[in-house]
Amino acid sequence: MKSAVVQLPGLNRDRDMIAALTKISGHQPVTIWQTETEIPDVDLIVIPGGFSYGDYLRCGAIAARMPVMQAIIDKAAKGVKVLGVCNGFQILVEAGLLPGALMRNASLKFVCREIKLKVVNAETDFTRAYAQGQVIRCPVAHHDGNYFADEATLAKIEGNGQVLFRYAEGTNPNGSINDIAGVMNEKGNVLGMMPHPENLIEAAHGGSDGRGLFASALDVVAA
């Protein structure tokens, strides 16, 4: 699987993502800087976590207006898979690639801990390595992960199976509506999620529950 990791000022999880993708796919991702307007032929584009542009204005608002985002939008329109984790999720929402909004955590505090996720839809290119309803462990680290959507949007994404992950009962760290932790677009090739699967891919790091997401994408390419 060929992949690319986007780099923007303030993102600080790019090295973790590069390490995870390299270990799982056997190929080191190319890195794409914010000013680039072309992205090479890849199977997966990842926008990692962090605090792009210091989270000024709104989380992801400035990053979503960088030149590289139009290239990502164009690739997504052609069916290339795009994954946004944490700040990457916020950027995808700000860019209009995913529905809804991400607000300040209900606690008004930065949350950094391990939580449990429930796989709501295991029939996608991002989740097929998991079982339907499987509960996995995954770390979170964010201040603005409270997912919100209006009633019409919420009904649509729930009805379409666009919600892939929910925080398991009693573990919602931010107040997200319907315990939503990860959402994909209607086409099924763009996923945004607040938890960090790249930080739980091998036993030496405490477990490998996050590996399934990347393995799913890899299996689609290999099929």
Curated annotation (Swiss-Prot):
Q: What is its EC number?
A: 6.3.5.3, 3.5.1.2
Quote the catalytic activity from the record: N(2)-formyl-N(1)-(5-phospho-beta-D-ribosyl)glycinamide + L-glutamine + ATP + H2O = 2-formamido-N(1)-(5-O-phospho-beta-D-ribosyl)acetamidine + L-glutamate + ADP + phosphate + H(+); L-glutamine + H2O = L-glutamate + NH4(+)
Q: Which GO terms describe its cellular component?
A: cytoplasm
The cross-references to SMART domains, in alphabetical order and at most eight, read: GATase_5
Superkingdom, natural source: Bacteria
Location in or out of the cell:
Cytoplasm
Tell me the InterPro entries matching this sequence. Answer: Class_I_gatase-like, PRibForGlyAmidine_synth_PurQ
Please provide the record's keywords in A-Z order.
ATP-binding, Cytoplasm, Glutamine amidotransferase, Hydrolase, Ligase, Nucleotide-binding, Purine biosynthesis
The record's listing under Gene3D superfamilies reads: 3.40.50.880
Extract the GO molecular function terms from the UniProt entry. Answer: ATP binding; glutaminase activity; phosphoribosylformylglycinamidine synthase activity
Q: Where is the active site?
A: 86, 196, 198
Any single biological process term in GO: 'de novo' IMP biosynthetic process
For this protein, the record's Pfam families field holds: GATase_5
Q: Does the keyword S-adenosyl-L-methionine apply?
A: no
- Pathway(s) per entry: Purine metabolism; IMP biosynthesis via de novo pathway; 5-amino-1-(5-phospho-D-ribosyl)imidazole from N(2)-formyl-N(1)-(5-phospho-D-ribosyl)glycinamide: step 1/2
Q: Where is the Glutamine amidotransferase type-1 domain?
A: 3-223
Subunit annotation:
Part of the FGAM synthase complex composed of 1 PurL, 1 PurQ and 2 PurS subunits.
The free-text function statement in the UniProt record for this protein reads:
Part of the phosphoribosylformylglycinamidine synthase complex involved in the purines biosynthetic pathway. Catalyzes the ATP-dependent conversion of formylglycinamide ribonucleotide (FGAR) and glutamine to yield formylglycinamidine ribonucleotide (FGAM) and glutamate. The FGAM synthase complex is composed of three subunits. PurQ produces an ammonia molecule by converting glutamine to glutamate. PurL transfers the ammonia molecule to FGAR to form FGAM in an ATP-dependent manner.
- Supply the NCBIfam families for this chain: FGAM_synth_I, PRK03619.1
Question: Which protein are we looking at?
Answer: Phosphoribosylformylglycinamidine synthase subunit PurQ
Organism for this UniProt entry: Rhizobium etli (strain ATCC 51251 / DSM 11541 / JCM 21823 / NBRC 15573 / CFN 42)
Q: What is the lineage of its organism?
A: Bacteria, Pseudomonadati, Pseudomonadota, Alphaproteobacteria, Hyphomicrobiales
